[in-house]
Amino acid sequence: MNLLSIFRSSPEKQIERARKKVKEPHGDSANRINAAYRLLEIGTPEAVLALLDRFTINVSPSSQDEEEKEDVLRQIVKRGERAVSALIKFLKRERQVYWPVRALKEILLTKEFEE
């Protein structure tokens, strides 16, 4: 344990902080996008699950909302099978499932074509 590790927050706290930013509908889009990429960087199933919370809010203007959601979708699909458990967990607890279902479908179709 070095001196800097004392001041670093735990991965759980980092995920929770990024989750709050990614879900902020009235905040700056740059903050949401940076938080999304931070969650992708962390890369754990919990971080991906937190990232999926971006799909639970709507942002004005709707074109910005659509762009951000498309970007999150692409990044989740890139994770492939590593994102499946988080997607399934999200689908079991949330009502807004359009984007996560789309991600899961793309991941599973890609896997099917690779086999």
Question: Model segments located where?
Answer:
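Structural detector for internal amphipathic alpha-helices that build alpha-solenoid repeat scaffolds
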Residues: M1-P11, S29-T44, S63-R82, K89, ...
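Solenoid-like repeat scaffolds
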Residues: K23-G27, T56-S62, K89-Q96
